Design a protein with these regions (language model features):
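Hinge/beta->alpha junction and helix N-cap segments in small-molecule ligand-binding domains
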Residues: 1-6, 27, 50, 61-71, ...
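A conserved helix-loop-strand patch within extracytoplasmic ligand-binding domains
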Residues: 68-86
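Hydrophobic alpha-helical
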Residues: 6-9, 13, 19-39, 105, ...
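Structural detector of well-ordered beta-strand residues that form the stable sheet scaffold
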Residues: 46, 87, 149, 172-174, ...
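Non-catalytic structural scaffold of enzyme domains
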Residues: 11-15, 83, 107-112, 181-187
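Hinge/cleft segment of the Venus flytrap/periplasmic-binding protein
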Residues: 109-112, 198-237
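Flexible loop/hinge segments that line or gate small-molecule binding clefts
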Residues: 30-67, 179-188
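Local beta-strand N-terminus motif with an aromatic residue
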Residues: 18, 57, 144-145, 191
Length: 237
């Protein structure tokens, strides 16, 4: 997750003959500049999963993450009593996708009557121990915490901290994406809801969009976002 490493990887792929690139990277000025330089050189880039919105990327393939964050805010606002304190964790604020989720969540919570002072935020850098520590320290300082929103990885780190504090089943946990770990946590009741996204499309589409741009001159729309969003719980996972 170091910008210079991403730039070096882009340069390496170009040296190896890549004519187009699909990218998921930090929204960092140095990476955006390199994408612009590649565009000037006739090498298009498609972003997926997390966007570089201010770059000259050809297209973004992924979920409408701001809307997904708003959906999470809607769910949380209906699960937590008015006045309840909520923790919102984000993996890395330099990833546009994480920021979009968090901003959408905060916006909808505010609309539903939860002011900013009721929402605590923590950055976990997608690290298990950092997630565990952020949740554990928040629960220690605020034993009345009513809900946790996770816009990051390592949901299991959050759940373990809740268990260690003896709060399992006493607060609501809402996250994003689905894997075997999250599926198990949903079924056992440790996570209440998750909002998945179409990773298959995000991996499948970029090479074809690049091919069409390079070989056929067909330029895609600026964004190819997932259509319908779904909400998973223990009953439909």
């Amino acid at each position: 997750e170091l910008p210079q490493e991403s730039v070096e990887l882009l340069d390496e792929m170009v040296r190896e003959g890549a004519e187009g690139l699909s990218i998921c990277a930090l929204n960092d000025p140095s990476i955006c500049r390199r994408v612009e330089e590649l565009a000037d050189a006739g090498i298009p880039c498609v972003t997926f999963n997390s966007d570089l919105p201010k770059s000259r990327r050809l297209c973004f393939v992924g979920q409408d993450l701001y809307r997904a964050g708003r959906m999470a805010g809607e769910l949380m606002s209906r699960c937590v009593r008015p006045g309840g304190l909520v923790l919102a964790t984000v993996g890395n604020r330099r990833f546009d996708g994480h920021c979009q989720r968090l901003n959408g969540f905060l916006a909808r919570m505010a609309e539903r009557g939860f002011p900013a002072e009721q929402i605590l935020t923590a950055e976990t850098f997608n690290d298990y121990q950092t997630t565990y520590r952020a949740v554990a320290e928040t629960l220690e300082r605020h034993p009345d915490l009513a809900g946790i929103y996770l816009a990051n990885l390592h949901v299991s780190g959050c759940v373990e901290a809740v268990r260690a504090a003896g709060r399992q089943g006493q607060l609501r946990v809402i996250c994003h994406d689905i894997n075997e770990s999250v599926r198990r946590l949903l079924l056992e009741g440790s996570v209440d809801f998750t909002i998945p996204q179409d990773f298959r499309q995000q991996g499948y589409l970029p090479p074809f969009l690049l091919r069409d741009a390079l070989r056929r001159g067909q330029l895609p729309p600026a964004s190819r976002q997932d259509g319908q969003m779904s909400i998973l719980c223990a009953e439909n996972v």
